């Protein structure tokens, strides 16, 4: 029964992976083509491209981990190459979260309207320093990933190996104090960008409220470009927050799985849920970006035209064959 559930979850993971690769590859391809065409890249496009690349890598690592867990369980328990996979999973996980946080921060500084000198100073310089901020996210993610991977995943592999040898649920003896401290370190590391996004969300709401109040006092109405920009930014940030919460819970299931009776099943279940975040959020970003949305509509229109053309050719061929008979 457990094997059937694992196989079903694996097929689900493959479907989520395909959707995620399609959306993130589209974002990266459109922005790179625009970069080559204009020979420069806007800050928002740089953030979206970096986020798309990190999520493509994250999707590949998670799916590879699922395949090894289901198809090669011995390698999963004892293989030294799993340390490499664990490192890249932790790295791409933090890169994806921090790049999404940078996107929320960028929306906040570009759209929000405050008159504090510090805010105005940062607002004027956000485009100049965004590349350095992204580079800092890479360095910080590497710094977090190295010690966390070495401590947390060594205990996990030992537990899987012990359970396979003894076939007992609670026979795994791990250093729970070390596991708890490492897990706390990982959770705090992901909690910081979440708090930053949450702060950006509430400040955007405050900025929108002030803007609407000013528009009402001036009797010019509430629906203007600035209001619509606020609403689009809020939708993007809140979608990230909700998906991140689901991803965070699935991450907790995966990292805590060796305290559960069915370790492997808990891991692949957590990973299949975790794939929803990098897969679905890319399409939300496409719909919220004018350039990406227009490019996607062009692609859909071309695909529909090709399909209609093929269907017309098939009907035409059938008509010719009917006339011959």
From Swiss-Prot:
InterPro entries membership: GPCR_Rhodpsn_7TM, TAS2R
Keywords (A to Z) from UniProt: G-protein coupled receptor, Glycoprotein, Membrane, Receptor, Sensory transduction, Taste, Transducer, Transmembrane, Transmembrane helix
Extracellular topological intervals: 1-9, 77-94, 150-187, 257-266
Primary subcellular site in the record, as a coarse category: membrane
Recorded topology in the membrane: Multi-pass membrane protein
GO CC annotation terms, alphabetical: plasma membrane
Listed Pfam families: TAS2R
Gene3D superfamilies found in the cross-reference section: Rhodopsin 7-helix transmembrane proteins
Transmembrane intervals: 10-30, 56-76, 95-115, 129-149, 188-208, 236-256, 267-287
Keyword check for Transmembrane: yes
Keyword Transmembrane: yes
Glycan attachment residues as annotated in the record: 167, 175
Residue spans, topological domain Cytoplasmic: 31-55, 116-128, 209-235, 288-319
GO molecular function: bitter taste receptor activity; G protein-coupled receptor activity
Subcellular location: Membrane
Family according to the record: Belongs to the G-protein coupled receptor T2R family.
Function statement: Gustducin-coupled receptor implicated in the perception of bitter compounds in the oral cavity and the gastrointestinal tract. Signals through PLCB2 and the calcium-regulated cation channel TRPM5.
Note: Several bitter taste receptors are expressed in a single taste receptor cell.
The name this protein goes by in its record: Taste receptor type 2 member 7
Organism the protein comes from: Pan paniscus (Pygmy chimpanzee)
Gene that encodes the chain: TAS2R7
């Amino acid at each position: 029964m457990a094997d059937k559930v694992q196989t079903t979850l694996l097929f689900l993971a493959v479907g989520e992976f395909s959707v995620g690769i399609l959306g993130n590859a589209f974002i990266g391809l459109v922005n790179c083509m625009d970069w080559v065409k204009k020979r420069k890249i806007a800050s928002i496009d740089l953030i979206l491209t970096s986020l798309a690349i990190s999520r493509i890598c994250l999707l590949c690592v998670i799916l590879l981990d699922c395949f090894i867990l289901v198809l090669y369980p011995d390698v999963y328990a004892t293989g030294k190459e799993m340390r490499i996979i664990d490192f890249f999973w932790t790295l791409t996980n933090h890169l994806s979260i921090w790049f999404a946080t940078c996107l929320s921060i960028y929306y906040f500084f570009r759209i929000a309207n405050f008159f504090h000198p510090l805010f105005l100073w940062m607002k004027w310089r956000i485009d100049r320093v965004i590349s350095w901020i992204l580079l800092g996210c890479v360095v910080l993610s590497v710094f977090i990933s190295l010690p966390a991977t070495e401590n947390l995943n060594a205990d996990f592999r030992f537990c899987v190996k012990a359970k396979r040898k003894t076939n007992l649920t609670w026979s795994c003896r791990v250093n729970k104090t070390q596991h708890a401290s490492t897990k706390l370190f990982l959770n705090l590391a992901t909690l910081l960008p979440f708090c930053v996004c949450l702060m950006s969300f509430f400040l955007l709401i405050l900025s929108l409220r002030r803007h609407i109040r000013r528009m009402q006092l001036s009797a010019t109405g509430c629906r203007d470009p600035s209001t619509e920009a606020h609403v689009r930014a809020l939708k993007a940030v809140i979608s990230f927050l909700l998906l991140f919460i689901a991803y965070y819970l699935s991450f907790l299931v995966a990292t805590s799985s060796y305290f559960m009776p069915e370790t492997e099943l808990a891991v692949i279940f957590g990973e299949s849920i975790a794939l929803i975040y990098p897969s679905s959020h890319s399409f939300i970003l496409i719909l919220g970006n004018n350039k990406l949305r227009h490019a996607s509509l062009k692609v859909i229109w071309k695909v529909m035209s090709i399909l209609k053309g093929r269907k017309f050719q098939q009907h035409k061929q059938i008509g010719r064959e009917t006339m011959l008979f």
